[in-house]
Amino acid sequence: MSPAYPRELGRAFEDDEVARKYRYRQPYPSEVFEILRGLLVEPHTVLDAGSGTGALTIGLAQFAKRVDAIDPSAAMLREARRMPGSDNERIRWIQGTAENAPLDPPYGLVTTGASLHWMDPEIVMPRFGEALAPGARVAIVDTDSIYGEQKWRGEFLTLIRAFSPIAHHITTPDFVKALEASGRFALEGQRSTAPVAVEQSVDEYMAMLASTSSLSRMTLGPRADEFDRQARAIFARHGMTGVRAKVVSGVTWGRPR
């Protein structure tokens, strides 16, 4: 088995507030879709597994013949249907898990956007393999926000470690290595996008954090208000009204086994 996040944390994504706050997550750079377009093969259909609110799905529908967007959360899919472009006739929104949702293969590409670590690779990787068209691949997409040496960052990370129930966040490279070691994935290629500068207000940044499984109000429970208070105090001490970062996305592709 490859590493995965504690499954109980995934319940946060069933919460309407978490789903609403997903809109504050930093978007994928446009270069991600250029990479995915280059990976798509006949019949030019895509399975977007763990689609969430459609951050990948809606972009994929600009060039794929059909995108089957699968997510277990009704709240996420409701929010997805509110997004601009979500009514594209090429998109089919499907509630279910990647392990057991109905599929309509063959697919010219399977994508997972920051979602594969919530799945059981012993089930989904063989399932993806069976659903892929000849020559098609699985693409694992993730995003990293780079804050550099900003003075507030170290203090803020200490605060996150004090409140987050996750002691160690699994990086995508580590996850892919574990998949390879398990024999469930044959790596073929990797690309990273050029950094894209983004800026959010403090309110937007806090809303983005509240959309995560580890720092949502649902997860933090009675500690949520105290986390919010201490976080905003850090920004106030540093005279900050906004948060700047550079966003880099990585696309890793290969064949499931």
Language model segments and positions:
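Conserved catalytic/acceptor-binding region of the Class I
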Residues: 129, 133-198
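Conserved Class I S-adenosyl-L-methionine
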Residues: 177-257
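A short, conserved alpha-helix within the catalytic core of class I
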Residues: 119-128
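Conserved class I S-adenosyl-L-methionine
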Residues: 1-42, 44-50
